[in-house]
Swiss-Prot record:
Record SUPFAM superfamilies: Ferredoxin reductase-like, C-terminal NADP-linked domain, Riboflavin synthase domain-like
Organism per entry: Pyrococcus furiosus (strain ATCC 43587 / DSM 3638 / JCM 8422 / Vc1)
Protein name: Probable dihydroorotate dehydrogenase B (NAD(+)), electron transfer subunit
Domain FAD-binding FR-type stretches: 1-87
Gene: pyrK
Cofactor note (record): Binds 1 [2Fe-2S] cluster per subunit. Binds 1 FAD per subunit.
């Protein structure tokens, strides 16, 4: 059911990335998403970073309009929807790239792990979008940047390959090319990734978010490595009108 909620707080997290705290607290599993509607603009899926927290990157008309809103303004939401992370594993790697941090942050906060390490990658220092309190929820934070302007020069997958033996389970969200490499490193075992496809209805009716035999909104957005074997994941996605789009 569509509900009107107010924006209680908004702040800049990184370059072109904002956080929005909403008035309604939701019961959710880390990895689930909501559909957020701006009247006269569009409706889009957004992963939850917390019970009433979303993080958004400015990339088009919808996000441009969302960025104009301030505290006290209203948006409309429905959900949460989809399947979240399982929470399996004792010593885990939580991997996020760019704006893939919201569901990973939620898992870090609410997961029950003996040991967890966050591996986060951004293109530059300016684009690091980590919540300030992330270190409270994990045992170690490792940051990589493509250009070496902060942390380790390279990618989260480089760190995973180097420290693979430390983890019995891996969770990840971010660019699909990165996720595909993580699946390869893990040989599709003991790994879950949050997939992204163009999504319209959010409830498994329209079929626009098809991924092999699955619908991302209904069967995902979180999938196990085994589920993604022999699918197009990591090879191509589709445009809103269904055409194949190379990654």
């Amino acid at each position: 059911m569509l509900r009107r909620v107010s924006i209680e707080e908004t702040w800049e997290v990184a370059k072109n990335i904002k956080a929005f705290r909403l008035s309604e607290k939701l019961e959710f599993t880390p990895g689930q998403f909501i559909m957020l509607w701006l009247p006269g603009v569009e409706e889009k899926p957004l992963s939850l970073a917390d019970k009433n927290l979303i993080m958004v990157k400015k990339v088009g008309r919808f996000t441009n309009e969302l960025f104009k809103l301030k505290e006290g303004d209203y948006v409309w939401i429905r959900g949460p929807y989809g399947h979240g992370f399982s929470g399996k594993g004792k010593s885990v790697a939580l991997i996020a790239g760019g704006i893939g941090i919201p569901p990973i942050y939620a898992l870090a906060k609410y997961g029950n792990f003996k040991r967890s390490i966050l591996i986060y990658g951004a293109r530059t220092k300016e684009e690091i979008a980590l919540p300030k309190d992330i270190e409270s929820y994990v045992d170690e934070v490792i940051i990589t940047t493509d250009d070496g302007s902060y942390g380790i020069k390279g990618f989260p997958t480089d760190v995973l390959m180097e420290r693979r033996s430390e983890f019995d389970y891996v969770y990840a969200c971010g660019p699909e090319i990165m996720l595909a490499k993580i699946l390869e490193i893990m040989e599709f075992e003991n790994v879950e990734v949050s997939a992204e496809r163009y999504m319209k209805c959010g409830i498994g009716v329209c079929g626009s978010c098809a991924l092999g035999p699955y619908l991302v909104c209904r069967d995902g957005p979180v999938f196990s490595g085994k589920q993604l074997i022999n699918t197009e994941f990591g090879k191509y996605s589709r445009t809103p009108d269904g055409r194949i789009k190379p990654l």
